[in-house]
Amino acid sequence: MSARDSDHLNGQCFPHPGIGHGTVVTVRITVLGCSGSVVGPDSPASGYLLRAPDTPPLVLDFGGGVLGALQRHADPGSVHVLLSHLHADHCLDMPGLFVWRRYHPTRPVGKALLYGPDDTWLRLGAASSPYGGEIDDCSDIFDVRHWVDGEPVPLGALMIMPRLVAHPTESYGLRITDPSGASLVYSGDTGSCDQLVELARGADVFLCEASWTHSPDRPPNLHLSGTEAGRAAAQASVRELLLTHIPPWTSREDVISEAKAEFDGPVHAVVSGETFDIQAPERV
């Protein structure tokens, strides 16, 4: 895996500059935003653009500022959306996407898919409505579907596996796998739990939240420290750990150091605008 500038997929695989002649990368993720809990001075809140051959562009989470960042990389009218949960920093740029899909001069044809927790339609409809107590019916622009824990969802050439994780609201980690076996696991927001380790088992890339530094006084079932993110990566035997969801008030350097103390593979804290190519290891 390597980071480099994004370019348009056009349904093709990517030559990987760091692996060898003829090797291709089939999954590409661009960090639209990675600031934890709130929009940061240098990054929107959570949002990640995922592209793969024979698959429509997907956005994992849609927090504050993500719609603006998305416009630098893809047509917002072309994307489908996968929401891990409905806390504001993961979904509240969605009303802006409602406006884009309804009122752009070249309005998108058909509906986009929107996957999320059970009350996605009601919660986002309330946020988008101009009147208190009313729901903006988004069924004209989105086909809203709900995650079911452990039930895989095919999207284009990819398979998405949602698993409930430990967070105060209904929250899912997602495992995305392509036909070659390349796998990305996104933790969403979670505290330490067995489901997260199970979901991440053997993943090529583990995009994992690390919202704070480690302390025994941290509340359970809310977020991970750098120590806990690194420990989960080690327990799951992932190939590479990408840390995300670090709030502006948390030291990135301390979180990275904590994770490295627990996990001996590559560790990197992502920044907005980075692009990563993901590939399964070559099989002998």
From Swiss-Prot:
<dbReference type="InterPro" id="IPR054857">
    <property type="entry name" value="cyc_nuc_deg_phdiest"/>
</dbReference>
<dbReference type="Pfam" id="PF12706">
    <property type="entry name" value="Lactamase_B_2"/>
</dbReference>
<dbReference type="InterPro" id="IPR036866">
    <property type="entry name" value="RibonucZ/Hydroxyglut_hydro"/>
</dbReference>
<dbReference type="InterPro" id="IPR001279">
    <property type="entry name" value="Metallo-B-lactamas"/>
</dbReference>
<protein>
    <recommendedName>
        <fullName>Uncharacterized protein ML1173</fullName>
    </recommendedName>
</protein>
<dbReference type="GO" id="GO:0042781">
    <property type="term" value="F:3'-tRNA processing endoribonuclease activity"/>
</dbReference>
<comment type="similarity">
    <text>Belongs to the AtsA family.</text>
</comment>
